[in-house]
Amino acid sequence: ALVSRLMELDLEAFRRVERVNVEGALLTLAAAGRHLKAQGTGGDIVIISTKNVPCPGAGFGAYSSTKAACHQLGRIASLEMAEFGVRVNMVAPDAVFGAGPFKSGLWATVGPDRMRARGLDEAGLEEYYRSRNLLKARVTAEHVANAVLFFVTRQTPTTGATIPVDGGLPDATPR
């Protein structure tokens, strides 16, 4: 993760984040779309977005802006792929926490910068994210997986939609 205010943001560091979040999504959507179209049976694509799309944070410009572009690519893909029976939806979690074998290795990378940016230790960072949502929920990978499962089990005829998995962040998602 890259924590930097826009005025100090290194362009090459930004481009690394952009290549993963935007170019990676574009290439994946294009390849999956071609495959699912050729297969002729339709299908589902679920993009893991972020609460940072509707509610970015200061110092997280590279992440927030590139994930917003990724999210928008998903919305465009939903328009372009619907005629082939392909549904494209997004899941937008806040910070996802786990323990033991369910703890994401991502936090080893992004956690220290986020902790420094907020002046918190690991327990304090988790409490910060938990305490700011309406349900005071600790968002876990299982919560995110359940939202993905909702889309891919085709319980509703939905494409181009976003499910927030954030415990109810008042400023992140129109409710």
Enumerate the language-model features and the residues they cover.
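Catalytic Tyr-X3-Lys loop
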Residues: 7-27, 46, 70, 135
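Active-site loop-to-helix junction immediately N-terminal to the catalytic Tyr of the SDR YXXXK motif
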Residues: 9, 56-64, 76
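Amphipathic alpha-helical dimer-interface segment in Rossmann-like NAD(P)H-dependent oxidoreductases
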Residues: 20-40, 78-79, 153
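Active-site helix of classical SDR
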Residues: 29, 66, 74
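Residue(s) in the substrate-gating loop at a strand-loop-helix junction
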Residues: 50
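Short, small/polar-rich loop/turn modules that mediate ligand/substrate recognition or access, typified
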Residues: 82, 87, 158-160
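A glycine/serine/threonine-rich, flexible loop-to-helix segment
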Residues: 96-132, 174-175
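C-terminal substrate-recognition "lid" of short-chain dehydrogenase/reductases
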Residues: 134-165, 170
